[in-house]
Amino acid sequence: MAAPRGPGLFLIPALLGLLGVAWCSLSFGVSRDDDLLLPYPLARRRPSRDCARVRSGSPEQESWPPPPTNPGASHHAAVRTFVSHFEGRAVAGHLTRVADPLRTFSVLEPGGAGGCAQKRRATVEDTAVPAGCRIAQNGGFFRMSTGECLGNVVSDGRLVSSSGGLQNAQFGIRRDGTIVTGYLSEEEVLDPVNPFVQLLSGVVWLIRNGNIYINESQAIECDETQETGSFSKFVNVMSARTAVGHDREGQLILFHADGQTEQRGLNLWEMAEFLRQQDVVNAINLDGGGSATFVLNGTLASYPSDHCQDNMWRCPRQVSTVVCVHEPRCQPPDCSGHGTCVDGHCECTSHFWRGEACSELDCGPSNCSQHGLCTETGCHCDAGWTGSNCSEECPLGWYGPGCQRPCQCEHQCSCDPQTGNCSISQVRQCLQPTEATPRAGELASFTRTTWLALTLTLIFLLLISTGVNVSLFLGSRAERNRHLDGDYVYHPLQEVNGEALTAEKEHMEETSNPFKD
């Protein structure tokens, strides 16, 4: 009895198909670009705001704030594969949810940096593998004949292509993590305050704030006839499709559906409704048809619609920009040159750099006390101020920025702490140019001079005193000698009873008057 062959036989075509795709990638290389799905003519550029009929008072874009930063949260993207039925036909594809898109999502130029300037085309695999993409899809539209990137393209903070204000649906992420969807003026694209770090252009805004927005997009982006038919046909024809958007949690959404123009796949209405049911809030349509490609971990994971050079096989098309999901990266990757990127978050290396990108100078709550400028080395104080936070006025004898200059005033005049001008109207006095207080050598010199002056003064006073004493001594001696050489008067002692005094008195009278009777 023969062994059952059913399950094994069903695997053979699938394996052959995968081998065929792999062989095409390795051997045949370039596709024939035969599944074209173009929204506009190739030869005509539309002017800015062409046919725009925006409702009065309604903003032309939606901004979604970034989710709260959670360094410990998982950054793994969730890829879901679906096979769903639309109008009785089965459609297979992928829907990817990406957490923390500011750090895990990038718009890549074809073949790497410089691809748009050089008008290169490359397969999604060739662009995604060197960039380390875990998940990658084709991105924006391009000119098939020249490879020119169309619309706005900002790749990792670099504006590499500008639409000049041409109105097509845009999807971008600003430096602070805000997700922007909709229509942008040229000034908004070039905004220097909160610039875009990732931005690309699509065609047709599929979902706006949870509602399908295709009709409004057709009015804004115009209905023009082109090589593959009208803009209406571009919207309504079934084909392979790709899209990018976000959900209510701020997660980025990538959508891919296999198909072939007019044979299998989805139209834009079906894709928009499918995304709306997946809680997508805003989304735009990206390049589809033969460009639609999905790469997982560096390997083609979709079924291209373009034929290889050998019509037996299908080959991925060489496209333009690529949307890439990678391991968490810092924005900017070098943390503005002031930090180290660790698991998608910048750890600032300086004491004064702060912020998600280490790009904000912070010198503390006092902010240099409004008397200085905060720099990466701390506060640089204005003239007349000093201290770590510029809160102290210059000490006496110093002036200028940070009080680094000594005053040059003479005669102890005042010195302006800001300009250094000498003015007698100032209350404070200038000190010596070198220091605000005398140095040890100056103190020693001052002490020696003082003691010398005091010593000389004392010696002088001592000499004067000695001279005066000698003069007095000599004068006293001369007076004494004069009394010894001349007459003297005898004064007898007085008796107690007075008799001797009377007799002596009478004797003296007789002696003094010899002519008395």
Swiss-Prot record:
GO molecular function: N-acetylglucosamine-1-phosphodiester alpha-N-acetylglucosaminidase activity
Record field: transmembrane: 454-474
Subcellular location: Golgi apparatus, Golgi stack membrane; Golgi apparatus, trans-Golgi network
Chemical reaction(s) catalysed: N(4)-[6-(N-acetyl-alpha-D-glucosaminyl-1-phospho)-alpha-D-mannosyl-(1->2)-alpha-D-mannosyl-(glycan)]-L-asparaginyl-[protein] + H2O = N(4)-[6-phospho-alpha-D-mannosyl-(1->2)-alpha-D-mannosyl-(glycan)]-L-asparaginyl-[protein] + N-acetyl-D-glucosamine + H(+)
Gene coding for it: Nagpa
InterPro entries: EGF-like_dom, NAGPA
Motif (Tyrosine-based internalization motif): 488-491
Main location: Golgi
Keyword terms: Disulfide bond, EGF-like domain, Glycoprotein, Golgi apparatus, Hydrolase, Membrane, Signal, Transmembrane, Transmembrane helix, Zymogen
Annotated glycan sites: N215, N297, N367, N389, N421
Name under which the protein is recorded: N-acetylglucosamine-1-phosphodiester alpha-N-acetylglucosaminidase
Bilayer topology: Single-pass type I membrane protein
EC number: 3.1.4.45
Motif (NPF internalization motif): 511-515
Biological process annotations from GO: protein glycosylation; secretion of lysosomal enzymes
Ranges where the record places region Disordered: 49-75
Species: Mus musculus (Mouse)
Keyword Zinc-finger: no
